[in-house]
Amino acid sequence: MSNVPTELKYALSHEWVRADGDGVYSVGITEHAQELLGDMVFVDLPEVGSDVSAGSDCAVAESVKAASDIYAPISGEIVAVNTELENSPELVNSAPYTDGWLFSIKAADESELDNLLDADAYLAAIEE
């Protein structure tokens, strides 16, 4: 069974969201998603300063098995990306909830977080 930290919010498309304060949220992919994808070989991240809409594809994770779109779980402006992934994409596999984060978003509308799942609901969704 996948590790699903209870302090995070989740999208059905397997992204997690962590509140960093001041309306900024870190985003990554779940342990379940990285297990399905396999070993990461490249992560194409969004441009800092770009605006993204909830549900829009904004990054790509490429593994030995497949390339998979990563979707913005909330709308807002990309304020940071994890540059460590340029040389170490495997961090997405080894530490998906910590060092393997992908990007940070300054939320345009924090009420969109209400559309995301808590840990129990996400676990139920992936176990179906």
Curated annotation (Swiss-Prot):
The modification N6-lipoyllysine is found at residue 65. InterPro entries: 2-oxoA_DH_lipoyl-BS (IPR003016), Biotin_lipoyl (IPR000089), GCV_H (IPR002930), GCV_H/Fam206 (IPR033753), GCV_H_sub (IPR017453), Single_hybrid_motif (IPR011053). Binds 1 lipoyl cofactor covalently. Its cofactor is (R)-lipoate. It comes from the Bacteria. GO terms for biological process: glycine decarboxylation via glycine cleavage system. Keywords: Lipoyl. Residues 24-106 form the Lipoyl-binding domain. GO terms for cellular component: cytosol; glycine cleavage complex. Belongs to the GcvH family. The glycine cleavage system catalyzes the degradation of glycine. The H protein shuttles the methylamine group of glycine from the P protein to the T protein. PANTHER family: GLYCINE CLEAVAGE SYSTEM H PROTEIN (PTHR11715), GLYCINE CLEAVAGE SYSTEM H PROTEIN-RELATED (PTHR11715:SF3). NCBIfam families: gcvH (TIGR00527), PRK01202.1 (NF002270). The glycine cleavage system is composed of four proteins: P, T, L and H. This is Glycine cleavage system H protein.
